[in-house]
Amino acid sequence: MTEEFRHYTVLLKETVDGLQVKPDGVYVDCTLGGAGHSEYLLTQLNEHGHLYAFDQDQKALAHAKTRLQKYVDKGQVTFIKSNFRNIKEELAEHGVFHVDGILYDLGVSSPQLDEAERGFSYHQDAPLDMRMDQDAPLTAREVVNTYSYSELVKIFFRYGEEKFSKQIAREIERVREKQPIETTGELVEIIKTAIPAPARRKGGHPAKRIFQAIRIAVNDELGAVEESLEQAIDLLAKNGRISVITFHSLEDRIVKTMFKEYSTVQDLPPGIPVVPEEFQPELKVITRKPILPSDSELSENNRSRSAKLRIAEKIKSR
């Protein structure tokens, strides 16, 4: 693996094995990243099986093509540079309308976090960027310097669950009146200034929640997850499975709620003794509680500590 794209794959076996891979099946990795999940899945496919792999990041795609070269040569994998919110449209262009399994790893990949110039990290000084797709127009710099006080407060509360949202937004407003905020380092100092000293000393890095909130806003991450999951459930063939790894409560809530919605029997007209086919739920939830990383995985990769895996199975086609 190239040094610049070294990535630890979280919940590798649990995620892929949870799909109950059929050797001749059609599968989708919506978050290719370092290609760890894709590689493990491809080892379980025969010459009739196929994987479609999505990523917005050109570097991730280039790395994956090298890592998965033997499967590329066999024609078993197709790479798609697109946001996974376009899953249905993109697969339709390849003549694919039903698949046997879909997986999502919703964490920011380690190389993106570690690559200073991408602006995701609050540990390194870099231009305010935070775009997953480097061709996308909206950057963190634009959010920080042009969004109103009330817009910033809403983003920080909603996406970062930050209790000092108002103080931080007010400090951003004060600083940018004098000159634009250009770097992650400047933003970190502003956040530290706005948060009372006792609060800064507990609960991890003081900028963590704000950086998460801005990243989610820049990439419309929650909207993309919701849109994509709706399409993914529709794309699944009967008995097909979906595995989703989340890393914070906002994403996990979306997955949990959607799985519950699609696995619940609809309200029936009174007096019907048997649930008719049209009222049967589409999904069966496989994981009553989310699967968490093992102690051994946590000791190898501290970034996996907040990971949660949920799995569901399609039991009825629309």
Swiss-Prot record:
Q: Which domain of life is it from?
A: Bacteria
Q: Which InterPro entries match?
A: RsmH, SAM-dep_MeTrfase_MraW_recog, SAM-dependent_MTases_sf
Pfam families per the record? Methyltransf_5
What's its top-level EC category? transferase
Q: Which UniProt keywords apply?
A: Cytoplasm, Methyltransferase, rRNA processing, S-adenosyl-L-methionine, Transferase
Query: What are the recorded GO MF terms, alphabetically?
Result: rRNA (cytosine-N4-)-methyltransferase activity
Binding-site residues for S-adenosyl-L-methionine, renumbered to this chain: 35-37, 55, 84, 105, 112
Could you tell me what this protein does?
Specifically methylates the N4 position of cytidine in position 1402 (C1402) of 16S rRNA.
Cellular component terms, GO, for this chain's entry? Answer: cytoplasm
Q: Where in the cell is it found?
A: Cytoplasm
Q: Where is this region: Disordered?
A: 294-318
Protein name according to UniProt = Ribosomal RNA small subunit methyltransferase H
Among the record's GO biological process terms, what is one?
rRNA base methylation
Q: Provide the catalytic activity annotation.
A: cytidine(1402) in 16S rRNA + S-adenosyl-L-methionine = N(4)-methylcytidine(1402) in 16S rRNA + S-adenosyl-L-homocysteine + H(+)
Q: Give the HAMAP family listed for this entry.
A: 16SrRNA_methyltr_H (MF_01007)
Which family, according to the similarity comment?
A: Belongs to the methyltransferase superfamily. RsmH family.
* EC number, as in UniProt: 2.1.1.199
Q: Which organism is it from?
A: Enterococcus faecalis (strain ATCC 700802 / V583)
